Structure formats: C-alpha cells, structure tokens
Design a protein with these regions (language model features):
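Short linear motifs at protein or domain termini
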Residues: 1-26, 65, 135-157
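Conserved amphipathic alpha-helical segments that form helical-bundle/coiled-coil interaction surfaces
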Residues: 12-19, 27-89, 100-110, 118-129
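C-terminal regulatory/effector modules of DNA-binding transcriptional regulators
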Residues: 96-157
Length: 157
C-alpha cells in the first residue's frame, strides 16, 4: 500500500470514527467515561511506542464499541487493519504519543458531556491529526518508508 492510498483510508476512517463518537455520546454512562479516563491515564504512563500502541488500539476499539453500531465497528476495524503499520509509524517521534493522548482526553471530555457534535468533531480531528503526523513523519524519507507491504507512491509508479 502506498502512502497516498493510506492517506485516503485515513480520511474514510476519520469520518467513521466521528460517526461512532456521535452515536456513543448519547449512549455512554458514567462508568464508560470512567473506564475511558482510566485508559487515557494508562496511556499517559506509557514510555514508548511498544507500550503505548496496544493501549491506543484498545482505546479506539472501546470507543467504537460504545457506538452500539456493529456495521460502523466492522468497517472501522477493517480500515484499521489495513493501516496498522502506518498507524504505528505515525506515533513514533516528535511527541506524537503525548499529542495523541491529549486528543484522547478531549474525546473523553466531550463524551462525558454527551455532546454529540463535539464528540464527532473531536474524534474525526483525532484521526486526521494522526494522518498529518504520519505524513510529516514519512515526508522526504523515500524508499526507507517501505516496510513489508508498504510502498511510497513513487515506488508504485
């Protein structure tokens, strides 16, 4: 998959995640919000990508699950699997883990307030910020961006 193809998938995934947030905002309980807050705190203690990334994946999965919409969840997970290596790469360096987790905290706050509009916007923006972090990370890296199954758009030509 090329970086350009991954960027397109990020766009679709962002809006699915936003929809999941809108749906979850009307359904979450105080217990759900506390659980999500605990997950954010645990991610805040992660010292590196190897400890942060699985927690991040679990947090996103829980958010999508809280939407109550199995089709949104199915599509979101499928897109996430396609982007696995890109998502991980986008969280490496430049304070990306800290920024990502600050965005997670804003998502939890919007859910706590049951604000569907804000939750949708915050969750969409979170994925788009991840896309931006990835694109900044791979900019100018050329062939070394490639990992098994990943190619830059120039390599696809």
């Amino acid at each position: 998959m090329s970086v350009a193809q991954a960027a397109e998938i990020y766009d679709v995934r962002a809006h699915l995640f936003g929809l999941a947030g809108r749906l979850a905002a009307s359904r979450v309980t105080l217990r759900d919000v506390a659980e999500l807050g605990g997950m954010v705190a645990e991610m805040g203690e992660a010292k590196d990508i190897d400890s942060y990334y699985p927690l991040n994946v679990a947090f996103h999965a829980r958010l999508v699950e809280l939407s109550g919409n199995s089709r949104v969840a199915e599509l979101y997970y499928a897109l996430g699997k396609e982007l696995h290596l890109f998502r991980r790469r986008g969280l490496v360096g430049g304070g990306a883990i800290v920024l990502s987790n600050q965005e997670h905290l804003r998502i939890v706050e919007a859910l706590r307030d049951h604000n569907g509009d804000l939750t949708e916007r915050t969750m969409t923006d979170h994925i788009l910020a991840g896309k931006t972090r990835l694109l900044e990370r791979v900019k100018g890296q050329g062939p070394e961006v490639s990992e098994p199954g990943l190619r830059t758009s120039k390599e696809n030509e």
